Regions:
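A short beta-strand-to-loop transition that corresponds to the Sensor-1 phosphate-sensing loop
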Residues: 7-11, 70-73, 120-123, 139
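Signature of the SF2 helicase/ATPase Hel1-core->accessory helical subdomain module
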Residues: 2-20, 131-161
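Conserved catalytic network of the ASCE P-loop NTPase/AAA+ motor domain
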Residues: 1-2, 61, 108-113, 127
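Short secondary-structure boundary/capping segments
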Residues: 17-24, 83, 134, 180-182
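C-terminal helicase lobe and adjacent C-terminal extensions/tails of nucleic-acid helicase motors
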Residues: 54-63, 69, 74, 78-81, ...
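Conserved two-lobed SF2 helicase motor
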Residues: 110-125, 137
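Interdomain hinge/linker at the junction between the two RecA-like core domains of SF2 helicases
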Residues: 7-61
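Loop/turn-to-beta-strand initiation segments
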Residues: 1-6, 65, 114-117
Length: 332
């Protein structure tokens, strides 16, 4: 027997999924009284509609401090070049170690009340404890917008913080998950004055589940359990018959079209020593080097490799050997 506890600021209503795919699972909603939720509202969401990156950069520069979150690394790099004044950048083009250093600098600047602007992709929306007076979030899924809002007036130091949702001319693959979430959120921004309300969040996730019903059914654990006869006569699942290999093959958290490369940071003694250890053939440092690595698409990898700036020294782990390709502000 086991129990699972789901916690989120943007909690979906899983009852429809459980009832359909896991009908024998017992579940309870731990929070049913929402009357006091209003006391936790520390920011207000405003829809700016369609605008330009130049306008966003200009508006952010007028704020006490600001975080701008966009959907793609390409857009973040373009926006960062437009921002004036003291600015910082965060994206997956930077190694985890590099991002951690920047986050620590930003945190200190914010605590000292300094006027700064941070441009980031969605990675700042989870597990990053920063507190901004103002947040600008490019139109995305409602869950992403609300997570970005969690970085606004986080500690309640101001009477109210502001989250500005903006749209720009950007094309997404038709039928993609992001395109679907954006279209759903557009309608909710028009319909609801308060997009943090329970009804708004529920309608958003209901729409997401309805859109993805066939895909959920195709990839559900229940389907594989039925196919593999995982249940005994009492209807209990045997752990020895669970098709773990099938689950693993279906689950892809990181795209298979990417490859991780190590960035040898000459300014980081620990990183440099790990790289030297790897060059000497000691593969035990592979895990430690993950914090000094960046994942890139195969076409980018092939381009860098053809230029002779990636070497694996016979280890199968590629290292960027030309540091001019890695920017101290924006990464690779």
């Amino acid at each position: 027997n086991s129990e699972a506890l789901f916690l989120s600021a943007t909690m979906p209503d899983y009852s429809k999924l459980f009832d359909k795919f896991l009908p024998d699972v017992n579940y309870n909603k731990l929070v049913t009284d929402r009357t006091n939720f209003k006391y936790f509202k520390k920011c207000e969401y405003k829809d700016m509609g369609k605008t330009s990156l130049e306008t966003i950069a200009e508006n952010a520069s007028r704020c006490k401090n600001a975080l701008i979150v966009v959907n793609t690394k390409k857009t973040s790099a373009e926006l960062y070049s437009l921002v004036q004044g003291e600015k910082y950048y965060l994206s997956a083009n930077m190694t985890p170690a590099h991002r951690s250093r920047v986050i620590e600098v930003v945190r200190n600047k914010l605590e000292n009340g300094e006027h700064i602007t941070v441009v980031s992709t969605s990675l700042v929306e989870a597990g990053v404890d920063l507190d901004f007076n103002t947040v600008f979030r490019q139109l995305s899924g409602l869950d992403s917008i609300l997570q970005a809002g969690g970085r606004c007036n986080r500690e309640g130091k101001d009477d109210k913080g502001y989250v500005y949702v903006f749209d720009i001319d950007e094309t997404y693959r038709k039928g993609s998950d992001l395109a679907m979430r954006i279209n759903k959120t557009k309608g909710l921004l028009e319909k609801y004055q308060d997009i943090t309300s329970y009804d708004c969040i529920k309608e958003y996730y209901d729409g997401i589940f309805d859109f993805n019903q066939s895909r959920i059914a195709e990839n559900s654990i229940a389907k594989y359990n039925e196919q593999s006869n995982s249940f005994d006569r009492q209807g209990l699942m045997s752990p020895y018959s669970i098709p773990f290999r099938s689950y693993a093959m279906q689950f892809e958290y990181i795209s298979a079209d990417t490859i991780s490369i190590v960035i040898d940071d000459p300014n980081d003694q620990t990183c440099h020593e790990l790289v030297e250890t790897l060059r000497n053939g000691d593969m035990s440092v592979r895990r430690a080097l993950q914090k000094y690595s960046v994942s890139i698409y195969m076409n980018v990898f092939k381009d860098l490799y053809s230029q002779g700036v990636l070497k694996d020294h016979g280890t199968g782990i590629f290292i960027l050997v030309n540091q001019s390709y890695y920017n101290n502000e924006t990464g690779l």
